[in-house]
Amino acid sequence: MATLKVGSAIETATSLLEAAGVPKQEAATTARCIVASDRWGIGSHGLMRLPFYLSRLQAGGINPKAQLKTVTDLPSLVVFDGDDGLGHWQLQKASEIASERAMVNGVAAVGVGRSNHCGALGIYVWPMINRGLVGIAFSTGPAVMPPWGGNQSLLSTSPIAAGIPTNPPTVVDLATSAVARGKIQAKAQAGAELEPGWAFTKDGAPTTDAKEALAGMLAPLGGVKGYAIAVLVESLTGMLIGPTLAKNIPDMFAASQDALPQQISHFVIAIDASKLSVDGSNNRTNEFAQEVKAAGGRLPGANRVNPEKLNDGDEITITDQVSEQLSSWSAKLGI
């Protein structure tokens, strides 16, 4: 394992993305989102993914110079065409716009279509939390999960995230599959076995082999209930925003598909929490947080560091394999 300072990791990721053609501001935002995942301990969505993004940038699957193109612009609803750009900076921008408009209109939603993978979805509810708002986020990806009772992958891991301005903030961040696919990839790189019940082979047989799982399918979280929530996420992203469904999204882990745009869609909603109360009180969020603590529990995501306030001196850990891949890319891109 290798240990890096957060500030150094962000600089490295920013430099690599810039060398691959991404403008400085978008590269810096993307790098911070990537490293925030590692800082949260979600290495499967952090620097481990950067070599895959770089490969796709070089092959043409990701447009380094992408710009958000406005499709719909209403007071409480904005939709952008992402122009095949990196999902991180695009979803961060979407969350900031949703937050700004919700503070004026009470609620706002922003969709981004024709985008790419955005990393850990929970990062993008923090622009809302930091403004005292409620945030909800959805995203799609390649089909890896069959419909309930089916034998073909039609749904992505269909992640959903939510942020509530409690003290400390509540951050819900989960895939509706039994496990995020990035964790399967991390297990495959490490040569480790999967937990039983996570995945199936391409023929539908249960497997604990990570490589078989990558070529196969993932189980839904909580059985039919997880499947139902996955359908909801797919509805709010691929079906309604588009331009494509999960079954047609290229696999970022397949080098043979690097040149194919993923055309992923994201959707965020911001709600002004101060406007929701029927009695004018805003104390119940903190009251609940205190009750959870008194009961011996903790709120979901209570230990998550605010991604907009990362400490450059903090440390993250990456595998030796990821460290070697980043060094290889640095040499390849002349850094």
Which positions does each model-derived feature cover?
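N-terminal glycine-rich anion-binding loops that anchor highly charged ligand groups
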Residues: 2-5, 22-48, 62-73, 261-263, ...
